[in-house]
Amino acid sequence: MNELRCGCPDCHCKVDPERVFNHDGEAYCSQACAEQHPNGEPCPAPDCHCERSGKVGGRDITNNQLDEALEETFPASDPISP
């Protein structure tokens, strides 16, 4: 049987088949890794610091660009269907 590796970027942990965390079809070693460390939660493995690879609160898009993308996706003029 193939060894499962955690789907978290920069995580080098093996996934325990009896304690796997699934998210979007990928296997992760912990809930923190499955959620991509949204609040900087550490990886449970003492020698792994994959939580450092995530950009907590960072993004490469301005609020104005985000507003425009949202308006393009959900125009205010579209009627809401019941």
From Swiss-Prot:
Any GO MF annotation of the entry: cadmium ion binding
Matches recorded under Pfam families: Metallothio_Pro (PF02069)
Changes seen on gene knockout: No effect on cell growth in the presence of excess Zn(2+)/Cd(2+) or in metal-limited conditions. Reduced long term survival.
Binding site for Cd(2+) 2: C11, C43, C48, C50
Induction section of the entry: Up-regulated during the stationary phase.
List of residues binding Cd(2+) 1: C11, C13, C29, C43
Positions of Cd(2+) 4 binding: C6, C11, C29, C33
Binding site for Zn(2+) 1: C11, C43, C48, C50
Disordered: region residues: 61-82
Residues annotated for Zn(2+) 3 binding in this entry: C6, C11, C29, C33
Protein keywords: Cadmium, Metal-binding, Metal-thiolate cluster, Zinc
Coiled coil segments of this chain: none
Binding site for Cd(2+) 3: C8, C33, H37, C50
Gene3D superfamilies: 2.30.170.10
Positions annotated to bind Zn(2+) 2: C8, C33, H37, C50
SUPFAM superfamilies referenced in this protein's UniProt entry, alphabetically: Metallothionein
Function: Metallothioneins are small proteins that have a high content of cysteine residues which allow them to bind heavy metal ions through clusters of thiolate bonds. Preferentially, binds four Cd(2+) ions. Also binds three Zn(2+) ions but with less affinity. Required for long-term viability. May play a role in the storage or sequestration of metals when present in excess.
UniProt similarity note: Belongs to the metallothionein superfamily.
Protein known as: Metallothionein
Annotated source species: Pseudomonas fluorescens (strain Q2-87)
Organism classification: Bacteria, Pseudomonadati, Pseudomonadota, Gammaproteobacteria, Pseudomonadales
Gene this protein is translated from: MT
